[in-house]
Amino acid sequence: ISAISSISDMSMLSNDKVTSIFAEDVVSYVESLDVYSNPSFLIKGRSGLDFSFDIQITGKKSELVVKPFNVLRQNGIERFLFCMGDIKEAREKATGKELKSLAIINDTIEPPKNLINALEEYGTPTLLWSKREEEESKNLFKIA
């Protein structure tokens, strides 16, 4: 019986649940920064597809969409970059604001440098979760 109980406890930490816990931690962190944010932000792209972001932060001249990555993998980066390409122009036209993005990466396992470089090459700054309390990291959330 204790073996069955242990297996049941392990299922509580399945990948989807860990990802969800990390996303919740990111939302809590952003809320602690005293910025105006919207959790669970949904936006339609030029393709007609809907895309969701865990956080949207609005300013007068720009807005920031935040994507937490519990584990940084190429397929996740590809989906994210497609999403940003699909929504950016339409969103900027609709709001009259510049659309920016930020990737927050759980770095308990060191993320591949080439994937971080890919995000930054396409204009998405990255914040390593272990560095979130540094002033430079907090400044990433300050938008006009």
Question: What residues fall within each predicted segment?
Answer:
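Conserved mixed alpha/beta catalytic, RNA-binding, or beta-rich assembly cores of soluble enzyme
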Residues: 15, 27-31, 74
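A short acidic/basic microdomain associated with nuclease active sites
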Residues: 27-47
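A short, glycine/Asx- and small/polar-enriched loop/turn
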Residues: 49-52
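Active-site-adjacent loop/helix micro-motif of nuclease/hydrolase catalytic cores
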Residues: 72-85, 111
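Short beta-strand/loop segments at the ligand-binding rim of alpha/beta enzyme cores
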Residues: 95-103
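Interdomain/boundary linker segments immediately adjacent to catalytic/signaling cores
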Residues: 1-20
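Domain-level recognition of nuclease-like catalytic cores that cleave nucleotide substrates
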Residues: 103-144
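Active-site beta-strand-loop-beta-strand hairpin of nuclease catalytic cores
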Residues: 56-66
